[in-house]
Amino acid sequence: MMTKPNADSLFGPLVNVRQGSFNPSTWAIDLGLSRSTFSAAGYAAFRPAYPPSLFRTVLAYHRAPSAVGTLLDLGCGHGLIARALSPEFGRVVAIDPSGGMVQQASKLTDDPKITFRQASSEDLSFVADASVDLVVAGQASHWFDYTRAWPELARVVRSGGSLAFWGYKDNILLGFPEVNQILEDACYGEDEVAPGMESMATYWEKPGRDILRNSLRAVVPPPADWTDIQRVVFDPNRKTSSIAPEDEDRAWLHKRLKLGEFEGYLRTFSAFSG
């Protein structure tokens, strides 16, 4: 999802966000990132990387000169997006609520333009009004408390700036539909995966996981503050375990893994314990 602020609403009163059926008190960061078994290094090693085509799409929407302005990366994790987009901006501020992630990002980054900070999207008090050109959030926006985040974002993004959120949900193994069904059962099945081994179904944090699996459709920018909203959604065919040729340009995330590496990827799931 990509959107731009309305020019006449940056400094004016903000409309309350309609939460619908969501209980704001249940919105939180991914609690899996603070569990004792979580490894920030493992997350960096086994999670997929975003391809240049995704960043080109975001920058084409943003339509701004390169190497100038400020980028704000929300839920930056190990700093993947901040490092990739740094050449396009004069300054990058990357935040994450997890201290372990911020520490890992700092270890992996040697770029004086990037500042990492432990903070949340709901409290951007360290960011000046109308000082940010582009806000991004990759695989993080389904955890935000938007009753607090939207007002903060409307405050810090300058007139003519942009916001881009994206994420990925349940992966498929190309060419292995039977394995994909096993993985589906392990993640969301109601029955035991094996004798004495339950699925991860009850361990996903809600409503965050549901928001992500529904392609962030529940993340709706307040129309009084944001305009020119665009959504790009790609859903692979899980039954055939394939990607149609006409969808190749939209299938942005690929990662080749050995079996042991795929296990490492599964261990980065917030619902995984063991």
Question: Which residues make up each language-model segment?
Answer:
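A short acidic, Gly/Pro-enriched loop at the edge of an enzyme's catalytic core
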Residues: 125-134
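Conserved alpha-helix/loop element of class I SAM-dependent methyltransferases that forms part
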Residues: 48-69
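C-terminal lobe and adjacent flexible extensions of AdoMet/dcAdoMet transferase-like proteins
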Residues: 255-274
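Conserved catalytic/acceptor-binding region of the Class I
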Residues: 160-255
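A short SAM/SAH-binding and catalytic strip from SAM-dependent methyltransferases
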Residues: 133-147
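A short glycine-rich, Lys/Arg-flanked "PGG" loop and its adjoining helix->strand segment in the class I
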Residues: 148-159
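Class I SAM-dependent methyltransferase SAM/SAH-binding core
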Residues: 70-124
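N-terminal, positively charged/glycine-rich alpha-helical extensions of SAM-dependent methyltransferases
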Residues: 2-41
